[in-house]
Design a protein with these regions (language model features):
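Core alpha/beta nucleotide-donor-binding catalytic domains of modification enzymes
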Residues: 2-125, 135-148
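Class I S-adenosyl-L-methionine
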Residues: 70-84, 95, 99-286
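A generic secondary-structure signal marking the coil-to-beta-strand transition
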Residues: 84-86, 178-180, 300-302, 317
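C-terminal target-recognition/interaction regions appended to catalytic cores
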Residues: 240-373
Length: 373
């Protein structure tokens, strides 16, 4: 089978990379932010990945639903004529559904983009789609109504769906990051593949879609691991990983694996104008506050969200995390880099916004297994 992926809200391309390295072909990339799109182009060049067949579209997804509708429709139609399985993947900006964000829901500018993405899927009818967003969209009562309405719209347009609240830790990412993943397959594709589904059930039965096949750890294994809590902050200190810890889920394991000290983005971090003593007063592993969370070297990171004044401190250095360290926490390959001329604000925003690479890779493998089993 040939898989052609149209990527939306692409950012730095973490989600796309997980699909691409699983044998999917990224043919179209849409991103509104010019700086983020430059990161995407730079990383592809460094990783020596071929350019998307239909190139890059810099602009709002809303244009593709309105005045540029024919442009996108022709591209999708071309891949369908070639008998490709066409996939739409994307994670619309999510502050409006986040408890830590603005929580405006569908009324917020970012919230509206989720609805626009669903409308685009219904308009173009790809073979399958992936929708990624924050837990709040699925868990919060007032947002859940909007989420359920989106699903109903998709079901009416011929999609059969499956969903799961994932934690990136399950896929081997050193980061506690919960996200709702909604995946849908058009009934035409499932008929073509001889899937027999109950016409009255718009959801794929839980025992049919292998959500856990490509996870690395169960939630129970993660909870039973003896991760340390806090230690005194000792600058430039070193000590081995304690027994009973899932080492490959720890910050220090990934710092070492990605050789973050020698990474091209190693020297990119915010330097405070004042308050250095505060950087030294917070215990290693104390991530209890809204801001100034100090990571523990032998534990996983809290969610890599570096906006809204959220400051994450290095476990054993008196400074904030570097871009290289943030990339490691997002489980990117050590060869993945950002252009060094990007602003620090944009660098941390695009890294924090991304879907962790290993989670993306696992989900991409799961979809492929479902379609090819």
């Amino acid at each position: 089978m040939k898989y052609s992926i149209f990527s939306f809200f692409s950012g730095a391309g973490f989600l796309d990379l997980g699909f691409e390295l699983n044998g999917y072909d990224i043919v179209f990339v849409n991103e509104f932010n010019k700086s983020f799109l430059n990161v995407y182009k730079h990383s592809r060049k460094v990783l020596q990945l071929k350019q998307p067949q239909f190139g890059y579209h810099e602009g709002s997804i809303e244009c593709l639903l309105k005045n540029e509708k024919d442009f996108l429709s022709k591209l999708v139609a071309q891949k369908k004529i070639e008998q490709d399985i066409v996939g739409f993947i994307g994670g619309p900006p999510c502050p409006d559904f986040s408890v830590g964000g603005k929580n405006r829901g569908i009324e917020g500018e970012n919230g509206k983009l989720s609805n626009t993405y669903i409308e685009l899927i219904c308009q173009e009818k790809p073979s399958f789609f992936l929708f990624e967003n924050v837990k709040g969209l699925w868990k919060t009562k007032k947002h859940r109504l909007f989420y359920d309405d989106m699903k109903k719209k998709l079901h009416k347009n011929g999609y059969v769906t499956t969903e799961r609240l994932i934690n990136s830790l399950e896929y081997g990412v050193p980061q506690h990051r919960e996200r709702i993943i909604l995946i849908g397959f058009h009934e035409d594709l499932l008929t073509r593949l001889s899937y027999k589904l109950d016409e009255d059930l718009p959801d794929i039965p839980s025992d049919m879609f292998p959500w856990e096949k490509y996870t690395k750890y169960t939630k129970e294994e993660i909870l039973s691991s003896s991760f340390p809590t806090t230690n005194d902050f000792n600058e430039e200190s070193s000590y081995p990983c304690p027994n009973g810890v899932l080492k490959d889920l720890t910050v220090e394991y990934w710092f070492q694996q990605n050789d973050v000290s020698n990474h091209p983005n190693a020297e990119q971090y915010f330097v405070p104008r004042q308050g250095l003593m505060k950087f030294k007063s917070i215990e290693e592993g104390d991530d209890s506050k809204k801001s100034y969370k100090r990571l523990h070297r032998w534990r996983y990171s809290p969610t890599a969200a570096y906006g809204n004044n959220e400051v994450h401190l290095h476990p054993y250095k008196a400074r904030r995390l570097s871009v290289a360290e943030a990339l490691a926490i997002q489980s990117l390959p050590k060869t993945f880099e950002l252009p060094t001329d990007i602003s620090l604000t944009d660098a941390f925003r695009t890294v924090g916004n991304g879907v962790p690479y290993l989670a993306s890779k696992g989900i991409a493998a799961t979809i492929k297994h479902f379609l090819e089993q």
